[in-house]
Amino acid sequence: MTELLRCEKISKFYEEGSQSVQVLNDVSFTINTGGLVAIVGSSGSGKSTLLHILGGLDKPTTGEVWINRQSLQQLSANQLAELRNQQLGFVYQFHHLMADFTALENVMMPMLIGKQNKREAADLAEKMLQAVGLQHRICHRPAALSGGERQRVAIARALVNKPALVLADEPTGNLDQKTTESIFELIKQLNIEQNIAFLLVTHDLKLADKLTRRLIMADGVLREAS
């Protein structure tokens, strides 16, 4: 398997007044193409901070991240934005859909940002919404959708550019068990069919156990589950 993501000796400090607070401590690991990886840990352990750094949304104090052999720390702002748009997908606990746009328009957005033709973007967005079982909801705005439907739209948006890696921060945290199971089945299906790698941050140990690899974050230190 091909190495997709490499994270080496990542540490992160935040300044709080005269004190320096360490959130991540010398974190190193890799993910291969098509990997299904979970990171579990208590609140405040550094999981979300790590995910933001891996996605180029935050910078480490020390250390380096590579995606497809490109160092995020060596990219310009424009190059980093292009990499995020083309190679990464993001799913959050809160869907972050734009309230004034339909499900279709929300899913089209990453392609429009990438300057794709509007008609082609609409066609691809509709196909992706069909893939997540929402072909009957494409013209609905987020307020008219259930929590599970909104999260499915968010997943469709994350996947529409066919990223190599999806970073998901508590993607099922606000969902009931039945919806959580359906979301996982969707992730597994897309992983198999499109070889997309997923890195999920979750408190749900049952969900984490279904993935092929589990990492544990505690006090900013990451280790493999035994």
Curated annotation (Swiss-Prot):
Membrane topology summary: Peripheral membrane protein
Residues where ATP binds: 41-48
Gene Ontology biological-process annotations: lipoprotein localization to outer membrane; protein localization to outer membrane
Protein's cellular compartments: Cell inner membrane
Top-level EC class: translocase
Keyword rRNA-binding: no
Keywords, sorted A to Z: ATP-binding, Cell inner membrane, Cell membrane, Membrane, Nucleotide-binding, Translocase, Transport
Similarity comment text for this entry: Belongs to the ABC transporter superfamily. Lipoprotein translocase (TC 3.A.1.125) family.
Protein name, per record: Lipoprotein-releasing system ATP-binding protein LolD
Organism (species): Haemophilus ducreyi (strain 35000HP / ATCC 700724)
Name of the encoding gene: lolD
